[in-house]
Each structure stands twice: as C-alpha cells, then as structure tokens.
Amino acid sequence: MTARSRGRAVPSYKASLVRDGLKGTRIGILRQAYERTPPANNPSAVTVDPDIVKVFATAIDDLKSAGAEIVDPARVELPPAAQGGGCRGFKYDINDYLKTRGARAPVHTLDEIIASGKFHESIRGRLESSNRGTPQGPDSDACKADAAYRTAFGAAVTKTMDDLKLDAFVYPTWSFPPQLVGQTAQGSAGDNSQVYSPRSGFPAINVPMGFTRGNTLPAGMTMLGRAWSEAALIKLAYAYEQATRHRRPAPIR
C-alpha cells in the first residue's frame, strides 16, 4: 500500500474544507455493514441497538438536508472468504521487524516478548495465539490467498460504487453505544470498523452523528470511499460536521 501511494500525495487537505461539500453527491447506505443475522446459538440476540438505528436514521435525513442524494440500500456483492484459516502474519512481521533493530532492541522475537511479561495482561491470549505455529510471511500460501481476497474485496466495493455512481458509503461505526466504565456485558461486539475499510484497503473517516441514551452517549458514522479518495472523504465529513455540529466536548473534571 505504501509503495502504491507514490505519486498520489496531496499537498494540502485544506481545499477539502467546503461547507456545502455534500451538495450533489450520492451517498450509499451500506446496511450489510451493521444489519447482521443473530448467531444460530442465540437467535434472540440484539445485533444493533435501537438507539443507534434511530440516530443513524436521523443522520441519513441530515445528509439529505445537506444536499446529498441517498441510495438505500447500496449492497456490495462480496467475494467468498479466503480458504485455509487466513494469513497469520503477526509472528512473522514482529520477528522480522525486531531483526532490524539489532542489539538496540530489548527483545528480539515474539517468544521473548511473551517471556518478558512486559505487556498488559488483557492481550496475553492474543500474543500466545499469534505465537503458535510457523510464522507466515507474504510468500506463504495462506497470505497469498488473503492478499487475493483483499484485492477481490476492493474490486467488489469499487464495482458497487461505479454501478451506483456513489461518492461514498455510510454506516454506523459501532452498533452499540459506548460502554460505561466497569461495563463488560457487550464486550467488543458491534464494531463495524473491522471489515470494509481494512479488507479493501480503502480510506474511511468517522464523524459524530448524534447521541444515544437520552442524549448522553455519543454515536459515530463511518464514511467509506474509493481508493485514494481521502480528500473527497474529508470534504464530505467536513460538510456533514458543519451542518450538524454534533460534537460536544466532554466537561473537564
């Protein structure tokens, strides 16, 4: 991705700060990003909070009021998932990076990181899981299959945008309001930021879209664009932000 970005640098994003930047645009509602079927072992599970649904509906109306044409739904026909368990490249990548640090590094492998115990206990399970098995580099069959899947995923997103003449997709960033300190019931469920942008490699930007729980807990909306469309996304996000002014700084106590 870094190599492919050569020659695409934008000198300044200041020109993207246009208050009426949503006028004349076409925005697709990517409902499949957050409207999920409950798992078979828990068919009554709530997969998106009603407050989020309500706030997002208002956000769509706000986009319309700011001059955007809404395409709803805008569905992406995704490719079948890569087979073989996916690319488990973390162990390879971290060990390869630590080699470049030489004697300056206090640790030289993922094994040594785990043995040191110098990390937050909450990530121990992930570190140990990543350390199992043979490191998979970019030339491994699993990582090649994963790279091919990501390319196909990005092509599917682009095709939908081309077919529907979209400037961006939008969807709730999270399907649930923020948890309060000490709350653990929801865990990390409902994070909608881990699929469409990471798997396609395309840019996305998050903007405040309003409040839930009696106007107390914030909610965000993600705008997903084409490859290299950062300037266009900033223009859309800025126009939406200026039209709604949802951001409310928390009081300092």
Regions found by a protein language model. Give the residues of each.
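Small-aliphatic-rich amphipathic alpha-helix that forms the alpha element of a beta-alpha
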Residues: 78, 184-208
